[in-house]
Amino acid sequence: MKIIIATHNPHKTEEIKNFFKGYPVEIYSMADLGIKEDIEETGDTIEENALIKARFLKEKVDGIVIADDTGLFVEHLNGQPGVYSARFAGENATYEDNNKKLLKLLEGVPYEKRKAYFKTVIAVVEREKETLLEGKLEGHILDHPRGKNGFGYDPVFYVDNLGKSLAELTMEEKNKISHRADALMKLKNYILKRLEEK
């Protein structure tokens, strides 16, 4: 079975290849197939963005196409930054810029009102079928960054049942509980089911 990932990110490709090690699945990135175009994410939701990327690539290739998008949703901010998570503080914002903006908006807000969740959506597009798979991780936003690992909003996202921020976890610990791991596990189950049908 051939799976093509709608990404230019080598880390994402590697991560998914590792997930399917030992299975009769060939995984390719856009770079592997010489597709250099950037896909504009113009959707109003992360679901729409994942589908936009997958549909764009499906028009160019055979096989199963997958694409993902992730957002951080803060209850007190009516679900912001959401679909704008990567560019919350502006078009070329750094992770630090985004975290600073988020903490500023939540200044003085008590801990119990700082509930948030990460959500990753994986769109799977086949010839006749589109499927959305979702992974979620719930927690709270801290009032200052903690930890040196990870990236993005990890230093300000507190995982209550572990008593640590995502940036205080090792990669192995994070990969066991993350929204991304949750979505990838659902993808794996989906693909294994498809393999059984063949």
Swiss-Prot record:
Gene Ontology BP, a term: purine nucleoside triphosphate catabolic process
Chain residues that bind Mg(2+): 40, 69
UniProt binding sites for substrate: 7-12, 70, 151-154, 174, 179-180
Active site residues according to the UniProt entry: 69 (proton acceptor)
Oligomer and partners: Homodimer.
Protein family (similarity comment): Belongs to the HAM1 NTPase family.
NCBIfam families named in the record: PRK14822.1 (NF011397), RdgB/HAM1 family non-canonical purine NTP pyrophosphatase (TIGR00042)
UniProt-recorded name of the protein: dITP/XTP pyrophosphatase
Organism from which the protein derives: Thermoanaerobacter sp. (strain X514)
